[in-house]
Amino acid sequence: MARRDIGTDDPRVRVRPGKGSRPRTKVRPAHADAVTGMVTRIDRGHYRIHLDDPSLTEDGGGDITAMKARELGRGKVVVGDQVAVVGDVSGRKDTLARMVRIEPRRTLLLRSAEDGDSAGSQKPVVANADLLVVVTALADPPPRPRMIDRYLVAAYDAGMEPLLVLTKSDLADPTELLSLYQPLGVRCLATTITESGISGIEVVRQALAGKVSVLVGHSGVGKSTLINALVPAANRVTGHVNEVTGR
């Protein structure tokens, strides 16, 4: 009896695909209908995003909540990231959009881990910011030049422009501290609290206008006071410096 050779072209033969012949599943869809926005807050896997086109939301405010799509993997999303989202972008209560893409970052501010298993590693903090506003008091608490130096290094490493804002200039002369940083080309501004408000706040406002800014500085230097003056709706809680701890 002659042997019959039935090739794989025969319609009666069903070939089960092996790993090598299976279609690739890691190709990400284009999501041509995605809309873009900036991450403004992150809370336990939920991302608050302000859309570039606020009119897409029901209230016109432009703020929505999204979850990260599985296809993005474990990549770190940080505040300031420009992202693309699909799904429900109405911004209505209890609705979730889906974040499907993280756009390339212009700048990335990193912070060094100080303890635990990740000590010595760097953690991304903020993306796409233009200014790193280093807030330091001239007194009560006294300035910390070494901390200022670390902030300046972080700003330059991130590709950001540093801005040194000196608070409480009514309590100490800023000349000595300014002499350390003005020769480096660091822009320095001084403010003080008066009975009518904060003297110098308008100059700070102009320096920040049209830019994405990050405020840093240790406890008690007046960051919250500055934020409340610049953004009254922020309603940040302010306090007094403890005479014992200096905080």
Label every PLM stretch briefly:
Residues 1-142:
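N-terminal accessory targeting/assembly segments
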Residues 33, 41-43, 93, 127-130, ...:
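Short flexible coil/turn linkers enriched for glycine and charged/polar residues
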Residues 128-136, 157-169, 185-192:
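Conserved beta-strand/loop subsegment of P-loop NTPase cores
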Residues 146-156:
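Histidine-anchored nucleotide/phosphate-binding helix
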Residues 168-221:
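Canonical P-loop GTPase G-domain recognition
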Residues 219, 224-225, 229:
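Walker A/P-loop
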Residues 232-247:
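Switch I (effector-binding) loop of TRAFAC-class P-loop GTPase G-domains
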